[in-house]
Regions:
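A bilobed periplasmic-binding-protein/Venus flytrap-type ligand-binding module shared by bacterial periplasmic
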Residues: 138-145, 184-188, 263-276, 283-284, ...
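A ligand-binding cleft/hinge motif common to bilobed small-molecule-binding domains
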Residues: 92-96, 226, 231-250
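Early extracytoplasmic/lumenal segment of secretory-pathway proteins
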Residues: 29-95
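Extracytoplasmic ligand-binding site segments that recognize negatively charged/polar headgroups
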Residues: 39-43, 83-84, 89-226
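Paired acidic/hydrophobic, glycine-rich loop segments that form the ligand-binding mouth/hinge
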Residues: 82-88, 214, 231-236, 252
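Periplasmic-binding protein-like
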Residues: 135, 164-173, 201-207, 214, 247-271, 284-308
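Extracellular/periplasmic bilobal clamshell ligand-binding domains
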Residues: 310-347
């Protein structure tokens, strides 16, 4: 029996979600415990940061997968003896961790390579972390299935509703949904971060059309695009290009007008975590480590001395071309947005 496209996509999401983040171990067997996103991101993180740190120090590192709020809640459940030493996340989730008193203040005394970071990037951490890199959340598509991809976000929404393609959208549990979908569409459709209903209305339109599958983890859109279960998806630029180069040359990527939302990846030292976390963060801030990471994942690095290949330089997100939503507002509004999404969309 062949399942309908939405059910096949859902089956993939359930399986991969369980494998990737269903039961992360937080046992403190290693000298340092750090977090990472899954898929190609984890592989690059290990190669460019974890392995060099282990080689330099002789210490061992556990890498656990999951999502920022999951890690924040784990640390918050036992702040005196946290199960994590260094957390990655978004700027808005980093602000939540800072406000809850779960992370340490940092300086170039503990992390000398902070001096190499771009001031605008360093500023997002407010002294309690820094971005490793940032990417845009635009559209990944099959060049065969979508030979004329939408050039604006409104064309994407209208084309999905009209059935020009079957689209993949992130569900509410995905890391990019709050600002990359809700905040984006609210802005595009005449609302604001204080009034996101116009954006949610567009997600409801697409869902009602039957031409959307929702995903909750980063690998499922890649698999669904390759299998033909979806034709186009809202997705991160670097991950899309990495998949194009490694497995699927049919993939195309673009940032529809008026732009795609920028997502810096924040890193923070957990309060009461191992002091080795500072040494690890110094590797994360290094030009060598970020050059490796940025070229593998094709993200724009925070270290000003990073060297890109010519191909990667032409693809990475540019500060002036991205949409930068207010992270402070997003962090405060996200619980309200999640409740609205759950009531109106439910996935």
């Amino acid at each position: 029996m062949t399942l309908p496209r939405p059910l096949r996509a859902a089956a993939v999401v359930i399986l991969l979600s369980f494998n990737a983040v269903g039961a992360p171990s937080v046992a403190r067997a290693a000298d340092l415990t750090v977090t990472a996103y899954g898929g190609a991101w984890e592989q690059a993180y290990r190669k460019c940061f974890v392995q060099p740190f282990e080689k330099q120090t002789g210490k061992t590192v556990d890498v656990i997968l999951g999502s920022p709020m999951q890690w924040i809640n784990q640390v918050g459940a036992n702040p005196a003896h946290p199960p994590i030493d260094v957390m990655v996340g978004l700027v808005d989730s980093g602000e939540i961790a800072r406000e809850r008193g779960l992370v340490d203040k940092i300086s170039d005394a503990e992390i000398p390579n902070l001096k190499q970071l771009k001031p605008n990037m360093l500023g997002y951490g407010k002294g309690y972390g820094f971005p490793i890199a940032f990417g845009d959340f635009g559209l990944m598509y099959s060049k065969k299935a979508v030979p004329n991809p939408p050039q604006t976000w409104k064309e994407f929404v209208d084309g999905t509703v009209a059935g020009k393609w079957h689209a993949g959208l992130p569900g509410i549990s995905y890391v990019a949904t709050a600002q990359g979908v809700i905040g984006l569409f609210a802005t595009v459709y005449g609302g604001s971060l204080d009034n996101v209903q116009p954006g949610l209305d567009q997600v409801k339109r697409m869902k009602a059309s039957g031409n959307v599958s929702f995903y909750s983890e980063p690998n499922s859109p890649l698999i669904s695009l390759r299998s033909g279960d979806i034709d186009i998806a809202m997705y991160f630029d670097g991950r899309a290009w990495a998949e194009h180069d490694a497995n699927n040359p049919d993939i195309g990527y673009l940032n529809p007008r008026p732009g795609a939302v920028a997502f810096p990846t924040m890193v923070q030292k957990v309060k009461n975590g191992s002091p080795l976390g500072y040494q690890f963060m110094n590797v994360l801030a290094s030009a060598e480590g970020q050059s490796c990471f940025a070229n593998l994942l094709q993200y724009s690095a925070s270290n000003r001395d990073v060297k890109y290949s010519d191909q990667v330089r032409s693809r990475i997100a540019k500060d002036d071309d991205s949409l930068w939503l207010s992270f402070d507002v997003v962090s405060k509004k996200t619980p309200e947005w999640v409740e609205m999404w759950n009531k109106q969309i439910g996935r």
